[in-house]
Amino acid sequence: MDNLLTALILSIVEGLTEFLPVSSSGHLILAGDLLGFVGEKAATFDVVIQLGAIMAVVVLYWKRFWGLVRPQPYARFAGRRGIVLLMLTSLPACILGLLLHAYIKEYLFRPATVLIALVVGAICMILVEKRKFKPTCISLDDMTPRLALGIGCFQCLALWPGFSRSAATIMGGMLLGAKRPLAAEYSFIAAVPIMVAATGYDLLKNLSMFTAADIPFFLVGMIGSFVSALLAVKVFVALVGRMTLIPFACYRLLIAPFVYYFMVN
């Protein structure tokens, strides 16, 4: 298949799934396997095209990010405090990711491990939604250091490809007292620093394997993921207040047999 067409297909998969609790890395690994695009370069491409999805969130939530630089009076998720909260959320996964980076890329970016993560993540989502609790945190201005760090610890689950960073942080937020729409919103915003760190680290480690001829391939990937992520986040934000995570869990369980049949068996 033409390289640019492969890049476009994978970028659309990335953009549509990055911020939904269905696992973008899992879908990318499986799509890449079907398209015959596998190996070290494919794994790095999957990370790099996240830049497009990151930019989509920055565009959609630009006021929140601008508030980190130029805080408004009475805004609590802003300025130095907002930056500290995001750092607390990013820190656990950054530390664990640095320690386990080689192991993760060597052993966890495989269809079999993705399949297990899809199923385990789906079961966890159903259990969280079945749990009755009263939210104590309604808006971003209610965020506390304890809640931010707790969500960061749950985010470590996303180092297992197939589990879903979005699912991990939304579930973590809900279990720790955040209302579902807030957990989703914070999940999107908190994704930016951790994804920038992961992308930058991967690029620095693997820069030597790329040439100028790869630039169009990556540009198509980033543009495609940007446009599709804009659409996906807008739709998810509109729905998350009215629906639970259970439909996404069911989707994960439904695709698991196909993953097993086409990728593992």
From Swiss-Prot:
Record-linked Pfam families: BacA
TM ranges: 42-62, 82-102, 108-128, 157-177, 181-201, 217-237, 244-264
Principal subcellular localisation of the protein: membrane
Catalysis: reaction(s): di-trans,octa-cis-undecaprenyl diphosphate + H2O = di-trans,octa-cis-undecaprenyl phosphate + phosphate + H(+)
Known EC number: 3.6.1.27
Disulfide bonds: none
Keyword annotations from UniProtKB, A to Z: Antibiotic resistance, Cell inner membrane, Cell membrane, Cell shape, Cell wall biogenesis/degradation, Hydrolase, Membrane, Peptidoglycan synthesis, Transmembrane, Transmembrane helix
Keyword Iron-sulfur appears in the UniProt entry: no
One Gene Ontology CC term in the entry: plasma membrane
This protein's name: Undecaprenyl-diphosphatase
GO biological process: cell wall organization; peptidoglycan biosynthetic process; regulation of cell shape; response to antibiotic
Gene, per the UniProt record: uppP
GO molecular function term, any single one: undecaprenyl-diphosphatase activity
Entry annotated with the keyword Mitochondrion: no
Entry-linked InterPro entries: UppP
Subcellular location: Cell inner membrane
Additional note from the record: Bacitracin is thought to be involved in the inhibition of peptidoglycan synthesis by sequestering undecaprenyl diphosphate, thereby reducing the pool of lipid carrier available.
Known function: Catalyzes the dephosphorylation of undecaprenyl diphosphate (UPP). Confers resistance to bacitracin.
Record's bilayer topology term: Multi-pass membrane protein
